[in-house]
Swiss-Prot record:
EC annotation from Swiss-Prot or TrEMBL: 2.5.1.19
Known role: Catalyzes the transfer of the enolpyruvyl moiety of phosphoenolpyruvate (PEP) to the 5-hydroxyl of shikimate-3-phosphate (S3P) to produce enolpyruvyl shikimate-3-phosphate and inorganic phosphate.
Active site feature: 314 (proton acceptor)
This protein's encoding gene: aroA
Biological process per Gene Ontology, one example term: chorismate biosynthetic process
Protein's recorded name: 3-phosphoshikimate 1-carboxyvinyltransferase
UniProt signal peptide: none
Organism: Vibrio vulnificus (strain YJ016)
One Pfam family per UniProt: EPSP_synthase
Catalytic activity annotation: 3-phosphoshikimate + phosphoenolpyruvate = 5-O-(1-carboxyvinyl)-3-phosphoshikimate + phosphate
Amino acid sequence: MESLTLQPIKKVNGEVNLPGSKSVSNRALLLAALAKGTTRLTNLLDSDDIRHMLNALTKLGVHYELSADKTVCVVEGLGRPFTATEAQELFLGNAGTAMRPLAAALCLGKGEFVLTGEPRMKERPIGHLVDALREAGAQIEYLENENYPPLKINATGLQAGTVNIDGSISSQFLTAFLMAAPLAQGEVKIHIVGELVSKPYIDITLHIMKQFGVDVVNNAYQEFIIPAGQSYVSPGQFLVEGDASSASYFLAAAAIKGGEIKVTGIGKNSIQGDIHFADALEKMGAEIEWGEDYVISRVGRLKGIDMDYNHIPDAAMTIATTALFAQGTTAIRNVYNWRVKETDRLSAMATELRKVGAEVEEGEDYLIVNPPQQLTHAAIDTYDDHRIAMCFSLVALSDTPVTINDPKCTSKTFPDYFDKLASLSELA
């Protein structure tokens, strides 16, 4: 297996223009495909998850042109749901942002579809979404294990009416149903069962739907009403915001070993909840400055904090490695959904943090981290999880090197991450 050893970094300084957001890129691609008219998407993320979505759209008869650097995509919208005259199998890798929304969108049209992916995808639950789609009349069967992909869909359209969605595991199930709902056969009401996790990701979905001409009534995240007779219409141009989760590594690096780092492509008006990572860093002692389309982080004396991170689960992982540089104990709470991401992130983070010397308590939905006096050089296993690889790069901001196994797994969201980090780093 390939590995990369990062030597100790004395200081970080500079500016990073963020790659496009994965969450925004795949939502916008899907809506552009369903919309009437042509959409020009700019700052699209070039990564595995986006490629899986684009490959699926090609198989579904969508025409698009991708620029040489793959960050501009012109999509000719179908102006209707997807149809297939012969059975189509779509391989979606480990891309939850493609699997869940496509599972819902494919129920709208006509045809037979099989959705499958990598072995890890077959361990990521989808039952709550399938239950809701079945309530709306969808014909879906599990081809291997109950509640998990691969799925076989016999599409005949989605009925109007009320459906129930369990919101306690992942907000992607609700996102998927919301995006399909305007093309159902009438008004749709979605009732949320349990406490909805990761609400800011729902805000992203609603914001993008609005840009494509669809209004949704949001009753305090307990009920969503999608009035009948709406359809998606291209906004013409669509700018994909920088990935706020990806910003977290650079903002944290500056807080630990700045100088200062300016991150561009997101700002105080960002639609992504993960920009609130900067607020958590500020609470820990970093100096943060907000602009319209940038955030600056400067070094501070960091102290451990005890916080609920349900609203920013992806960026919260970065807090776990930032905690290695803070005085005292850091508690990351209410992040059960780490367990159903690219890997079981609670277990993985606890295991790898202990390797570098931290004392860690892993609970069902929390992590408590006590930093060591001195970090230990370790080979970090990344579990084919892009965020674990990027989080643990921060260990090099000490006087200890760190080895990252399978560093190319960052291609899921940030293919040139390690090059970017190196360009901002002054080695010890």
